[in-house]
Amino acid sequence: MRWVGFAILVYVVMLLQTTVGKLLTFAFESVGVIGPDLSAIVAVFLALRVRELNDVVIAAWVLGLGVDLGSAGGAGEMTVVGPMSLAYVLAVAAVFRMREAFFRDRIMTQAILALVFCLLAHGTWVTAQSLLGRADTSWSDYGATLRQAAALACYTGVLMPLGYRLLLKCERWFVAVQAGRARRGRMMR
């Protein structure tokens, strides 16, 4: 990984998540407000393109920390920082292990892996927030929040192929060595 380029990418993604991401949200009566998780798109891209698991896990932890800090409560509200970081690490490790079973440049592969990533990450986060929250959470509230997380996962999965193509154009700025089998000619250069 090229960490300076990755740090700039994280900053840009967090900026886009808090500005453009708000424009991409939809409100449904049955589910609530859903919007895409742009950080998840970057995490899945890295899980598909980076060779080393350690680099992918550290990058996912940083992205999850950015999501935790970006979703902090308002003045006077308590926010638990850390569950999304750990959820991103768990989800990206699962996607990294599954990537060998798929063709990474296929649109359906990207969408399905983004869906799986978001279901794991946001499902873990919703469960942790429900368990660690100060207020008592009923099963119906927990179920409604899980439905909202599933809708967010579907929405992010739909946007993943577009995000993959955009990130592929600037991959050389933050990915040093791509995943896959190395060729002798490329390794000698």
Indicate where each model-derived feature is located.
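Terminal, non-globular segments
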Residues: 1-189
